[in-house]
């Protein structure tokens, strides 16, 4: 897709009809990664990350790919690895969440720091004690990440 609108249309189909669009298949990660690397803006990356999350939730093997993405030179790929488990609630893999955040906790980029806080705040709705302990154990988290993580606790 050459235009943002086409990508948004594709992502809308993926989200509305995941079983028909094969959204949660491991093979779909290649398309999502292409969107991340070529979309290069937060709104498209965040929407794509929800689709990535479908794969992560259905295929435990995708966690290894997210750990690799967490250290990728491309900031948007790293952001996706951090936020791909949003809204997974009790199906969130805290080990994966911890690993992708730890790989990025000292990054000074706003979009990474915000993603860390967002991912932690979202998981706090499910396991606030885990998030409090994580934030306390990671003094290297930026003030923005800490504030966002603890906002509703």
Residues of each region from the PLM?
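Alpha-helical scaffold domains
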Residues: 1-153
